Amino acid sequence: MEIFPAIDLKEGRCVRLYQGEFSKETVMNEDPVAQAIIFEKFGAKRLHIVDLDGAVAGESLNLSVIERICKAVRIPVQVGGGIRSLVAVEKLFSVGVDKVILGTAALYDKTFLEEAVLLYKEKIIVGIDAKNGFVATRGWLDVSEISYIDLAKQMEKIGVQTIVFTDISKDGTLAGPNIEQLELLQKSVAIRLIASGGVASIQDVKKLNDMNIYGVIIGKALYEKTIDLEEVVEVTKLC
């Protein structure tokens, strides 16, 4: 199983939100580049970065920070948030990003998504963020009328190989992942799944590993030290 430490960027800083609420932010590190270096030092093999400002604005607003992170670490970096054109995708790849996560665009601009998947294949990941089972977009500020299962099935038909699934109600809560929704997703599509939201303990990670989930994104649990990064990397190596 792949472990993805999370760095959420807002106004150039590393922050955590509670249940996706921008009004409930906590600054975890004023220097996201330093945070990325710390994660690499303690064994991270990959990083997951979200441009929160970009997700709301519809364009990358933390590109310079992302570029500095990519230059500072030697591990692959995947990035999401506000990526809604091929130009934006290409710009991220040009600064060293390994994989790009499309969210809002996957729901509202299928032509762009299809072109991106055709050009970049497995380098394009789709982020599906669910609120009460329905897909949320534009930085989680809007909730659509499409279920997360239906969108996942559409993504599979287009040729998307990996989905990041987030249950917004679990995000930043340390309440454990939404196993029920993940199991339903697994039964519905044959796509690699990266679980996000609520992971609080090594036991949570082991549970996801037992389900054959491809990867897990860990945020608050690392910052609040309810999960030790070195330990979780070692544990998942042995599984």
UniProtKB/Swiss-Prot annotation:
<dbReference type="InterPro" id="IPR023016">
    <property type="entry name" value="Isoase_HisA-like_bact"/>
</dbReference>
<dbReference type="InterPro" id="IPR044524">
    <property type="entry name" value="Isoase_HisA-like"/>
</dbReference>
<feature type="active site" description="Proton acceptor">
    <location>
        <position position="8"/>
    </location>
</feature>
<feature type="active site" description="Proton donor">
    <location>
        <position position="129"/>
    </location>
</feature>
<dbReference type="GO" id="GO:0000105">
    <property type="term" value="P:L-histidine biosynthetic process"/>
</dbReference>
<dbReference type="InterPro" id="IPR013785">
    <property type="entry name" value="Aldolase_TIM"/>
</dbReference>
<comment type="similarity">
    <text>Belongs to the HisA/HisF family.</text>
</comment>
<keyword id="KW-0413">Isomerase</keyword>
<keyword id="KW-0368">Histidine biosynthesis</keyword>
<comment type="pathway">
    <text>Amino-acid biosynthesis; L-histidine biosynthesis; L-histidine from 5-phospho-alpha-D-ribose 1-diphosphate: step 4/9.</text>
</comment>
<protein>
    <recommendedName>
        <fullName>1-(5-phosphoribosyl)-5-[(5-phosphoribosylamino)methylideneamino] imidazole-4-carboxamide isomerase</fullName>
        <ecNumber>5.3.1.16</ecNumber>
    </recommendedName>
</protein>
<dbReference type="GO" id="GO:0003949">
    <property type="term" value="F:1-(5-phosphoribosyl)-5-[(5-phosphoribosylamino)methylideneamino]imidazole-4-carboxamide isomerase activity"/>
</dbReference>
<dbReference type="InterPro" id="IPR011060">
    <property type="entry name" value="RibuloseP-bd_barrel"/>
</dbReference>
<dbReference type="GO" id="GO:0000162">
    <property type="term" value="P:L-tryptophan biosynthetic process"/>
</dbReference>
<dbReference type="GO" id="GO:0005737">
    <property type="term" value="C:cytoplasm"/>
</dbReference>
<dbReference type="Pfam" id="PF00977">
    <property type="entry name" value="His_biosynth"/>
</dbReference>
<dbReference type="InterPro" id="IPR006062">
    <property type="entry name" value="His_biosynth"/>
</dbReference>
<keyword id="KW-0028">Amino-acid biosynthesis</keyword>
<dbReference type="InterPro" id="IPR006063">
    <property type="entry name" value="HisA_bact_arch"/>
</dbReference>
<keyword id="KW-0963">Cytoplasm</keyword>
